[in-house]
């Protein structure tokens, strides 16, 4: 393998070997603590614009399994591992990870001290970086560092969202027709609109398990477009980037909130809302809350959160670099979950309308299923609302 280098914005250089595509890439360097689930990480749209470091030292053991993908492609900017397995073993394996990275044109680096890198990011905060391969040694000049520092994740939701409305058997993973997690049955009880800001495949899977018809719509849809579909519930999906950048979407979510407030006042049908990750942040912003960037984010499948009402602690899967500020929440926004490590907001219940949201991923693919019951709560909100009207 040829040499590769990771150059951080502060001038720190890590030397390793090239994996995946050869070339260079710039992104926000982050780390994830997941021991497994690297395929879900690679195909999670929430990693758009980021160079992802796997803290677990050996990656690729079970190869590439298309059934485990969480979106149509890799959206991350680069990939960092300590050691890449070249001889995977799994009865479902279709190729090795290095070949897949090449096919997705993902520039990566292996054989670096990922523990030292993770400690640096933990102590200094996430920072931009550049992976360079195919050269003997990088020339570290101010112009290069300025280029790295200037990088910003932009147009993230626009890039990862679906471009068209999908429903029923249209919503199939095109490249792998044998996968049926987006083929829905016909005996539906309820209709849910999934507003796609970078949705992982496991979100509609979980809704379909609960006998819901799921209509996936692009980020560019308006509140009126969604209400014309006459949904029983609205799911606000996960996604990448700074939530505050999505001013247009936030304004449309505010209209949905106002629709529910008006419907409740007039005795009409309300539409329950459930937000996950970015969807949680966007709903909070639409309701007057504020968000801020975390020092190094929460990424991985082992993050403890505490439920305020019961005091129970759940282990959750997380992938976010921003959080809703807990201080001075509006009176109608009740803190439902908080992070046991740093006390940041992990969930909000809105008392004036049938809406709630969580920062973590209850669909957890990969990761723990401790909070899978939140999908049941969403469905129950919908059924209760339908029965009441």
Which role does the model predict for each range below?
Residues 233, 237-323, 367-385:
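Cysteine-nucleophile active-site neighborhood
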Residues 311-353, 389:
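Catalytic beta-strand/loop cores that center a nucleophilic Ser/Cys/Thr
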Residues 1-191, 195-229, 243, 251, ...:
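RNA-binding accessory domains that recognize and position tRNA/RNA substrates
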Residues 191-196, 316-317, 356-360:
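Active-site-proximal beta-strand elements of phosphoester/diester hydrolases
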Residues 184-188, 267, 349-350:
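Short, flexible hinge/linker loops that cap or flank conserved catalytic cores
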Residues 347-389:
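A glycine-centered loop/beta-turn motif at secondary-structure junctions
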Residues 107, 191, 272-274, 290, ...:
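Proline-centered loop/turn at the N-terminus of a beta-strand
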Residues 18-19, 56, 318, 340, ...:
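Short clusters of small/polar residues that mark proteolytic maturation junctions
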């Amino acid at each position: 393998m040829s040499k590769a280098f990771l150059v951080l914005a502060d001038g720190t250089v890590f030397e390793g070997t090239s994996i995946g595509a050869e070339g260079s890439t710039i992104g926000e360097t982050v780390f994830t603590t997941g021991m497994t689930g690297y395929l879900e990480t690679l195909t999670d749209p929430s990693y758009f614009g980021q160079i992802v470091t796997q803290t677990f030292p050996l990656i690729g053991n079970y190869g590439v399994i298309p059934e485990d993908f969480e979106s149509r492609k890799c959206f991350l900017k680069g990939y960092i591992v300590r050691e890449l397995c070249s001889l995977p073993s799994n009865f479902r394996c279709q190729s090795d990870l290095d070949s897949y990275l090449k096919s997705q044109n993902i520039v990566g680096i292996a054989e670096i001290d990922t523990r030292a890198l993770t400690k640096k990011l933990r102590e200094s905060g996430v920072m931009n970086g550049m992976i360079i391969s195919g050269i003997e040694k990088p020339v570290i000049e101010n112009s290069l560092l300025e280029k790295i520092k200037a990088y910003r994740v932009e147009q993230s939701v626009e890039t990862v969202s679906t471009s068209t409305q999908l429903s029923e058997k249209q919503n199939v993973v095109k490249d792998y027709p044998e996968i049926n997690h987006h083929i829905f049955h016909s005996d539906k009880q309820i209709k849910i609109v999934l507003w796609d800001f970078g949705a992982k495949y496991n979100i509609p899977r979980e809704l379909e398990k609960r006998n819901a018809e799921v209509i996936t719509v692009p980020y560019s849809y308006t509140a009126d477009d969604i209400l014309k579909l006459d949904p029983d519930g609205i799911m606000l999906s996960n996604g990448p980037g700074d939530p505050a950048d999505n001013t247009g979407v936030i304004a449309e979510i505010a209209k949905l909130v106002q629709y529910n407030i008006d419907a409740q006042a007039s005795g009409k049908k309300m539409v329950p809302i459930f937000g996950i990750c970015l969807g949680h942040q966007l709903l909070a912003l639409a309701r007057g809350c504020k968000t801020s960037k975390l020092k190094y984010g929460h990424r991985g499948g082992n993050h403890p959160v505490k439920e305020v009402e019961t005091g129970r602690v759940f282990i959750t899967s997380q992938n976010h670099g921003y959080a809703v500020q807990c201080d001075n929440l509006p009176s109608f926004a009740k803190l439902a979950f908080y992070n046991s490590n740093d006390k940041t907001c992990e969930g909000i219940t809105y008392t004036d309308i049938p809406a709630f949201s969580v920062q973590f991923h209850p669909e957890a693919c990969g990761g723990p299923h401790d909070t899978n019951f939140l999908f049941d709560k969403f469905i129950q909100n919908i059924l209760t609302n339908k029965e009441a009207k």
